[in-house]
Amino acid sequence: VTTTHPSSRTQDAVLSVRALHKSFTLHSIDGRIVPSLHGVDLDVHTGEHVALAGPSGAGKSSLLRCIYRTYLPDSGSVRLRTAAGPVELTTLGDREMARLRGREFGYVSQFLAAPPRTGPLEVVAATGRRRGLDRAEAREAAAAALHRLNLDETLWDVDCGVLSGGERQRVNLAAGTVEPPRLLLLDEPVSALDPANREAALALIDSLAGQGVAVLAVFHDMDAIRQLASRVVFVADGRIARQGAPAELLEAVA
């Protein structure tokens, strides 16, 4: 287990985070400022699956959201290696950031955000089109992803709003992994799934490594971490406390 953080950027890193800080103002408690991330350094490489572990409130989801720019960091650097070269995400304009999302990197949150009266097939196919597929290719890729995640075809054109939590989570994961980008951020992607569908989802995520897709994922499920992760990063109080191989690190923090 290593407790050191990278100081210089690794040249072949898909994602390189340095000195990342983020705080939140709690307006309901006298405007108190609460730190969430304290100088986080992290690299993720091509085909590497990195699991973020740690207690609730440690800053794991905040880190993903700062990388994806759902949250704007207070300070620090988030660099993504794109097809055109490295790009600093913290200073990128909104239009360019929107262009990179999906094509260069993706984010699967815990909850599906789908337009009203839109079915799973169209939701997943829309992501495929944003990633460069034509309409027919996108629908074919969407169908393959939904099949792999065991979503019954009778639900493919049903309004996503009436699906169960587990069904919505599978649609969300299918959309994230269709024609996958070079980096995928996952926030508790299997938390609502029953055992059979959980295994199908984990197998799909695991297969991304063979496609060279880097994954940075938040998991509370230690079995999922053992199955998927090539490296575990343990986050505590907004800092990276330690990191290492799954068997070694999980034994150390048990």
Can you say where each PLM-predicted feature lies in the sequence?
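Q-loop/switch helix immediately C-terminal to the Walker
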Residues: 118-129
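ABC ATPase C-loop
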Residues: 176-177
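ABC ATPase NBD coupling module
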Residues: 86-106
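H-loop/switch region of ABC-family ATPase nucleotide-binding domains
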Residues: 219-220
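Conserved ABC ATPase signature
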Residues: 159-163, 167
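Catalytic Walker B motif of ABC-type/P-loop ATPase nucleotide-binding domains
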Residues: 184-187
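Helix-to-loop junction immediately C-terminal to a conserved catalytic motif
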Residues: 68
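Conserved ABC ATPase "signature" region
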Residues: 137-154
